[in-house]
Amino acid sequence: MNKYITLSLLGLAALASHAQDFDSKPTLELGNKEQDVKFTIGARMMTDAAYYHSDFTPMHSGAALTDARIRTSMTYRNWYFYADFGFGKGKFDQKNIFLQYAVKDKHEGNHAVKVGYYTDPAGSMARLTSLGSYHFISRAGAANALGTGRELGATYKYTNKHVTAYQGVFAENQYNKVDAGINGVSVAGRWVVRPISTADQTLHFGLNMRYAHLGGGETYNNVLKKSLSLGQSLETYVDENQDFSSCTLDWANNTFDVGAEALYHNKRFFVRGEYRHKLVTKKRDSKTLFEASNDNIDTWGTLSAWEAANPLRTNHFNGGYVETGFLIFGSPYHYDTNEAVLGGLKGKALEVVARYNYTGLNDINKGEYFSAGRNQYYPDGYMADYPYNSSSVGGGNVNSFTVGLNYSFNKYAQVMLNYTLHKVDKDFLPYDKTIHALQARVLFSF
């Protein structure tokens, strides 16, 4: 069998439709030509160092092994299996693992059906781009706070030179581990058109949408109570504190996400951006909760009075970013048509990049007063002893400005340097207005 097995540095042309799962084409391949089977293995390591300066709330400067992973794939004719496992920060973390069947039609269109655990199509353009191919140390905060990551599901994707249509259905928890209730379910899609699509430049416009019925939760006074948490770190992995921009939404029931994106690149310049809006609806069994509240001396008397004192409303959040880069020298920027994302640096290269990001997790009723000492909003506009509960959400708004310099030694090794200025607006942290972050990364991938 040895004459059929090779271990070599190959271009992997036969895997061209699958190589997007790796940051670069895998170096190691085992192949059995007789059985038409190919097996690849790759790895990635990221080590970050960061210095932070904040107005009041401390952040932990230092260094961390932020990512370490092993990646494997197997191809048999039109079948493709991929598995990716992480060991960063000293813990095991399952990444992508899926099976895909793909065929090409007579019009050069690609049809692919995928089943497994991987990034939601509507997760955002940033989340669909591998971090090893990203042009910044972290994805934009809005993509992390309002986008969606990996889920267990099944999708169908159609791609040709000018169009990508990617849609599917997903389960909320990949292991069906819920304390109460049932697993959540979502349907999502991303649709991209490319008016310009050549080897040297690409212009694309995209739309994505996602509807999710949330699952899980806890039993509270004999009522199922579901919650949704949203948040982001300050675009860093050394200290992933989300206190500056995060919220937990009790009684969350459904979410609806919509996003728009645009991307342009030529040989030495790129610009891309996204806008995202998230709507969260609420639901609860008010009658049962009201009856449970009557078991003590303090009661609201009627259901309508209790509902007025405990208001429930739909929340809206939004955010977006714009990123740009200029290649000083190196191989031209390139576009991955199958994934509809910008590729990473290839070979020896030097680039400068810049980004503006806005994340809005404040949804505050006009005229309400906030007590930082009690971490509480007061609907009447002043502090009271027995106030109604507020439906305001003060998760925090963040404006972030980043500049960076990236140098790639070769197709395997790269160093990155980012400086970010964050402007924070969160009622619970009134003394934190400006945060500075200086970060560096060493990246190795094969």
Residue ranges: model-predicted function:
Residues M125-S130, I137, G215-Q242:
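Acidic/polar loop-and-plug regions of large Gram-negative outer-membrane beta-barrel proteins
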Residues T27-H53, T57-G215, H316-F317, Y321, ...:
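Outer membrane beta-barrel
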Residues F22-S24:
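Subunit-assembly interface segments of extracellular/virion macromolecular structures
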Residues D55-T57, K225-F446:
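Outer-membrane beta-barrel pore domains
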Residues N2-S8:
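Sec-dependent signal peptide recognition
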Residues L10-H18:
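Hydrophobic h-region of N-terminal signal peptides that target proteins for export
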